[in-house]
């Protein structure tokens, strides 16, 4: 198995944590085949520190945008707070979807202008789920779980953040990319 350090931003970095993790694994005689080590890294699928994989994540965000599967969202913290308040008042699920996803269909020129003006933005997934339909008409996804069997759930209809305004990926986005390229089969 491999040891990956899943810290994508400096706020969550704890000095000495990698050494502690490696030492605890050594103490319990749990060896790993590759990954982050006290004296560097070893293995074919590195770097094993997510904070060193920014270029990989940027590449995939660009691909998603080019394919129309992601978009820059220019909502400010104040606007996001207003949206949350309105959704709570209307007893709606909180999040950016449907009419709340106001940056979703901006033209290339509008996006370019906002970026030129220096407006901060995040990159959001452009979900394909329906938003304004009764629950029984919502799309569903079924997965075959090795232990529980078939599990059916509603398709995602939220335009979740993939890349923060700082250029740092969200945990979930980084995890999917890394699991794919590191050929992760079991967690």
Describe every region a protein language model picked out.
Residues 66, 71-187:
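Active-site cores that bind ATP or allylic diphosphates and position pyrophosphate for catalysis
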Residues 1-92, 168:
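N-terminal Rossmann-like or analogous alpha/beta NTP/dinucleotide-binding catalytic cores
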